[in-house]
Amino acid sequence: MTQISERFLVQAHLDAKQPRTLSPAEQARYRADIAAELKKQDAVLVAHYYCDPVIQALAEETGGCVADSLEMARFSNNHAASTVLVAGVRFMGETAKILNPEKRVFMPTLEATCSLDVGCPVDEFSAFCDQHPERTVVVYANTSAAVKARADWVVTSGCALEIVESLMDNGEKIIWAPDKHLGRYIQRETGADMLLWDGACIVHEEFKSKQLEDMKALYPEAAILVHPESPEAVIELADVVGSTSQMIAAAQRLPNKTFIVATDRGIFYKMQQLCPDKIFIEAPTAGNGAACRSCAHCPWMAMNTLERTLQCLREGSNEIFVDPALIPHAVRPLQRMLDFTQAARLRQAGNA
């Protein structure tokens, strides 16, 4: 694992712990109390697909949003609520605040970070960019507000290919950060001239190609869905490579009844909701004596619990603040992404 110490990974697991098992009655009480607090505080709950199913269900029940990071950003930007509660990891809360500086933004915990974010410190990244001033800086959404402020473009896995293709068509050379696997995939698909930062996601980097081949042999009729943050050897085995939303769409679209899925298992909630007659299997994250650390579930996403969500609302704790001096610089590449994807949607609608 690059730039992330073993101690940090172990501590992340210790901090996450396993959520206390709640009885059905306790869950119902927490959900009712959270719904009441959201209404009372003019707040909306926005949850990522990788959160635990109970959090995703709560977001849906209360008129919020369950989505990938791009749609979370768009939803927070467009929703009328004065307060946004982001169930996800810290960069998602920061993104909501950057796009909505006038709103109050909270998270169930501020400890929920991301290995990609931590693996791209702004000082080191800025120095890297300064060595290549002729290049356009494109960063993945999984980065800090400070890194976004240093960038020309922010992208998500759902729009990265199209944006890089557009930049390449304009003759631009690119610095890409932080996920090396996603960067390599984009580079291979587009042929763009890209310098890659050396970061990786602790969940997706654990998927194993040899074990995936063995699993495919057990389920020969299964389609393999792979997130592009996965290693290249895993991507090569995929029937579909895409963002969380793109994988969900593929599960709905493809005729296969069984799917092997190489991403965080939190996505199964939405897949099973939309495709109740289909079977979804976790891609293997261990084998040949190797043990998994994340085991197909982000330890930081797991920190978003019902108890922490209610505590956050009642106490007004875990509010997200972003340096006001950074916001004008960080909002520019984010707004470019939103404008680009909105224009692409309109073009697609016009061609429908």
UniProtKB/Swiss-Prot annotation:
Keyword annotations:
4Fe-4S, Cytoplasm, Iron, Iron-sulfur, Metal-binding, Pyridine nucleotide biosynthesis, Transferase
One GO MF term: 4 iron, 4 sulfur cluster binding
Q: One Pfam match, by short name?
A: NadA
Any keyword rRNA-binding? Answer: no
Q: What highest taxon heads this organism's lineage?
A: Bacteria
InterPro entries cross-referenced by the UniProt entry: NadA, NadA_sf, Quinolinate_synth_A_type1
Which Enzyme Commission number(s) are listed? 2.5.1.72
The yes or no answer to whether the keyword 4Fe-4S is present is yes
Cofactor requirements of the protein: [4Fe-4S] cluster
Q: Which reaction is this enzyme known to catalyze? A: iminosuccinate + dihydroxyacetone phosphate = quinolinate + phosphate + 2 H2O + H(+)
What is any one of the record's Gene Ontology cellular component terms?
A: cytosol
Q: Where does [4Fe-4S] cluster bind?
A: 114, 201, 298
- Compartment list: Cytoplasm
* Residue positions binding iminosuccinate: 48, 69, 140-142, 157, 227-229, 244
Please state the pathway this protein functions in, per its UniProt record.
Answer: Cofactor biosynthesis; NAD(+) biosynthesis; quinolinate from iminoaspartate: step 1/1
> Cofactor binding mode, per the note?
Binds 1 [4Fe-4S] cluster per subunit.
- The enzyme's main class, written as a single word, is transferase
GO BP annotations listed: 'de novo' NAD biosynthetic process from L-aspartate
Chain's role: Catalyzes the condensation of iminoaspartate with dihydroxyacetone phosphate to form quinolinate.
Q: What family does this chain come from, according to its entry?
A: Belongs to the quinolinate synthase family. Type 1 subfamily.
Q: What is this protein identified as?
A: Quinolinate synthase
Q: Which organism is it from?
A: Pseudomonas syringae pv. syringae (strain B728a)
